Amino acid sequence: MKFWMDKGADGWRMDVIASISKDQSFPDYPKTDGRKYYTGKYHSNGPRLHEFIHEMNREVLSKYDCMTVGEAPGSTPEVARLFTDPEREELNMIFTFEHMNIDRIPGSVNRKWELKPFDLRDLKRVMSEWQNKLYNKGWNALYFENHDQPRVISRWGNDTTYREECAKAYATVLHGMQGTPYVYQGEEIGMTNVQFPLEEYEDIEVRNAYQDLVVKNKTISEDDFRKAVWNKSRDNARVPMQWDDSENAGFTTGKPWFRLSDRYQEINVKKALEKNDSVFYYYKDLICLRHEEELLTEGDYQLLLPEDEKIFAYLRTSDKEQWIVVANLSEDTVSTEGLVKYVSDKKDIKIANYKDRTGIKADLRPYEAFMMRIR
């Protein structure tokens, strides 16, 4: 680590860092539900985990101006505080997977390939719990997409009629929270999932699951498995980056390792840069807002309308001011009646994905989102 820090590295993204300590008695996991493989209990969050990370901080990280983020599957907010509380001198932040599992059926023999319908209330509950439990005691790593997750607008939203509105809405929800937002390549132009024949997928996870679940054990049909792959495969986020509408999307003049999305001529960086109200420029505005507005970094968080199935809304509050962040994460037009009571006469729209939004009272159009200063 010292070698790379001395070379000028700015930080570390630590893959599955929660697995560096193991119970040295190496116990067997009890076989209870017919599964052949198990994860988590005996190889993650082991007895000396925090001892090792604190040593890493003491010997290396504390001696450099660097950022650290650890991948910690299975961690709760309580565990996350052990990693990220500044007084413990371990890491700056960790990636949680809890919100990534809301569309997964716990304990299913088909693992993530048995789809559970998206329920916005689950997403709000999990993300709000992390916001509140880490406030002043740690730091959140905020994300919807990465190399292991599909495109959020295809997974939980609308990637056709409202593709751009949906991409901006999810970006608004994420960037209004406390923490460090992570933007994965292509997310900033609204890239979508792909729908290839099963034999064209490169991801070893897909190939192994097909043989195990479809061919051998027959616990899921090929048709249902294909639908799940289209929804959740890691390869959705691993297609080549879409730079322009030329051959191979401008990514390479050679042969890419993986098939390009069929939509690259429609969705690419060149087109995004040519359109003033594109998803790309909306992300730039969000990032500028986070740099300029102290409240987004320091303010506390309060979820509103926790049981609403379409609206994700919350307050951010500091000693000086209060903002409301609102997103209609549905294809329907919905009323803001439940939010009006939180808004005073003083209204200041900070950012909105429908430019004619001026206040709180008008109905929310499909995937409409905004941030507004309310006092």
Residue ranges and their predicted role:
Residues 1-375:
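Active-site and adjacent substrate-binding regions of carbohydrate-active enzymes
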